[in-house]
Amino acid sequence: MRESDFFTSFSDRNTAALVLALYEADGPLIMKDLQSITNHTQTLRQRLDSMAEEGIVDLDVVFAPHKYVRVSLTEMGKETALLLSMADTVIPGDISDKSINMRYADPILRLMRGKEYVIQKDIKTVMPYYNSITKVLSRMEDEGLVLRTESDEGYREIRYSLTPVGKRIADVFQTIYNKICCKG
């Protein structure tokens, strides 16, 4: 499986928070207004560019009275934001602290979707970033999205399975992924 077939802008950190901030705004926001979410300008611009390529946001460069970038959700972006807001309300706490806003949460949930359990080693074959995936899985476990079990066999095998709430969140991310890949 190629990375481009599996990863989207939602695979990066803070994408969920950016979409929800745009959804909650009364109208288009200026890129500068979103810097409190992703405080590095270049990272924010790259994230917004990838979201624009996927059809989630529109970016308009305005030159009056000075140059700035206006960001707004597309129709598909509004649909994904609605799905994300439902997922956000299921998990308690601020979006900045939630697993769904962390890097690789989206592909991990989609990988686990529809399976009885997934072995940690199998997750690492798709995403070979051990620290990142263990951090996300730990947060998901704390939030009640996944259950962690260790096998009773002779070797240590860490298994993760989705809880009923985790299955609903995974369905949300699968729906968003389908919208992005099929453009609607």
Label each region the model flagged.
Residues 36-75:
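General nucleic-acid-binding
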